[in-house]
Amino acid sequence: MATPQLIFVDGTFAELAQEMADFVQVGEQVQPLLEQDKREDALDLIVKASHSLNAAPEKDFTPAYNLLIHLVLQSEEPKKYLPTLCANLLKPITSSPTHGFTLASNALTTIFNLLDKSNPLRFNVFMQIVRFIRQNSQFDLLKPRLKNVEGWLQEWKSDSESQRKLYVEVSDAANDGGDQEESYFYLLKALATFDRDNQDEVASDEAQKLSLRALRMAISSPTRFDFNDLRSLPSVHALSDSHPVYSQLLDIFTEQDLEDYNDFRDEHQGWIENEKLDHEKLQRKMRLLTFASLAASTPNREIPYASIAKALQIPDEDVEMWTIDVIRSKLVEGRLSQKQKVFLVHRTTYRVFGEKQWRELGTRVDQFKTVVDRLVGVVRKAQTDVEAQREREQQELERKLANAGLGESEQRGGNRGGRTGGARQTRQRTDDDD
């Protein structure tokens, strides 16, 4: 969408309308109507003749359309004239094949921005803008504005049906623009507008048609591996009655494996081809999903190459290639041990999380608890051993200190005795002293 524009005009309605009428060559018919103050009748003639603006010289296109937009917004019923203006702008600008898209885009954006933010007419204009973007394959220009759509719909007080129409239009524009993720996202938003408590509504032809389209997009997408958001929609549940084979196929992609997919093909021979689905793409996707399930259900987090080859129905020499592919798809994280011929799982994505997964989680928690209990036991034993060793060392140290103290005491006692005896000997009188 183009940058918002302001319109600067000067003159009375009659003067400006006559100027516009002359430009689109209906001046003679409009003049008497303006003289009689029949503004709406005059404007009606001008708008009907405004298709000629698409052939106006490039330099005159924007000023002329700005003037026409100003006149229409002065009307008592802009709603009456805006569809014609928008429809004309969706047609080729013959006077400027090179810049026609930009000129028309600017005019459409000007209409949108000059309407009050809460004016419901904005909804219709925005629908035309989306269609214009789609037919010119310029979805990237629209994408930054889509973050405002939900807020706009609330401001316009759009009902569920109107919201659905807009979301489908945006989904179509994204699809034609090659943005499959955005297309799928807005298709799901469209499906969410059906009243989930109204069984007739979710089972209606429109709901089933959109649900089937979303299902086909989901299973065919090379990057989409989570189908729970789709499966949670009541209109998709209703496919089990209106399109049971498609519903069965969705169940397989949601929580089953490659073997189930192959059984499905055998049961419904030729169906995938007749429905214009690509078997090679579906089979590849099922192999990746099967790998993810295998990784999620492996208790010891080590998957032998042979188990991978069997589950994916591939030669042993292709195991490493498929492992790399599943890691790139972000379904699994881990590393290959070529020496041990195993894949070491670090992280895996659960495709669904139901009773089976809760049981698996419980088993893993029990295993983890056992490991933790063992570690705690080892740590406690080590602590006990350390404390015992420390106590033995303390006792040994005390014993040595005690022994050392005793020996020193005895030595000091012996030395004192020797000195006393010597002193006595020097004082003792002998016969030789005489």
Swiss-Prot record:
Keywords: Cytoplasm, Initiation factor, Protein biosynthesis. It is found in: Cytoplasm. One of its GO terms (cellular component) is eukaryotic 48S preinitiation complex. It comes from the Eukaryota. Residues 387-401 have a biased composition (Basic and acidic residues). GO terms for biological process: cytoplasmic translational initiation; formation of cytoplasmic translation initiation complex. The keyword Protein biosynthesis applies. InterPro entries: COPS7/eIF3m, eIF3m, PCI_dom. Residues 179-350 form the PCI domain. One of its GO terms (molecular function) is translation initiation factor activity. Residues 387-434 are annotated as: Disordered. Component of the eukaryotic translation initiation factor 3 (eIF-3) complex, which is involved in protein synthesis of a specialized repertoire of mRNAs and, together with other initiation factors, stimulates binding of mRNA and methionyl-tRNAi to the 40S ribosome. The eIF-3 complex specifically targets and initiates translation of a subset of mRNAs involved in cell proliferation. Component of the eukaryotic translation initiation factor 3 (eIF-3) complex. Belongs to the eIF-3 subunit M family. This is Eukaryotic translation initiation factor 3 subunit M. The lineage of its organism: Eukaryota, Fungi, Dikarya, Ascomycota, Pezizomycotina.
